[in-house]
Amino acid sequence: MTQVTPAIIKNSITTIADYPKAGIMFRDVTTLMANPDAFKATIDAFIAAYKDQGFTKIIGTESRGFIFGAPLSYALGIPFIPVRKPGKLPREVVRQDYLLEYGEDTLELHVDAIVPGDKVLLVDDLLATGGTIEATIKLVQKLGGEATDAAFVVSLPELGGEKRIAKMGIKILKLVEFEGE
């Protein structure tokens, strides 16, 4: 697991106590996106890590994975593929259900987005429990692709997502981490 910690990235992320409920320390990356220098440092760190690594597709998970995955896709000249919540993609999809802290959710991917042999990089803003990214990995695998790496702006290691994804054989890049929930 690789960690890059430019201060500008970490310092641009706002922490909001007790949101969305008591006891949660919410890590708000919208303040990073509003800071051009921090956003550039974030994308540049991803570019440096993944340039010339042989990826054939970049997948961003809804919705902030789009914000970080699309510029990386552009910079590397690799197709960007969105993974969406149900009912948002217009063509035939493959679905994957996954568990949330209080219930279930589903992610979808166009059936023609990944072809057997694709080497896929997954991108999202934050890794907490790992449920969303695990569901995304399973979608890629259902279509015959190989998800080998996952990139996150923020990781919350105490919530177990890093261990969960590492057990699946995925290499993780986190730019910053925060303690607690």
Swiss-Prot record:
Its EC number is 2.4.2.7. The keyword Transmembrane helix does not apply. Gene3D superfamilies: 3.40.50.2020. One of its GO terms (biological process) is purine ribonucleoside salvage. One of its GO terms (cellular component) is cytosol. It catalyses: AMP + diphosphate = 5-phospho-alpha-D-ribose 1-diphosphate + adenine. Pathway: Purine metabolism; AMP biosynthesis via salvage pathway; AMP from adenine: step 1/1. It is found in: Cytoplasm. Pfam families: Pribosyltran. Belongs to the purine/pyrimidine phosphoribosyltransferase family. Homodimer. HAMAP family: Aden_phosphoribosyltr. This is Adenine phosphoribosyltransferase. It comes from Pseudoalteromonas translucida (strain TAC 125).
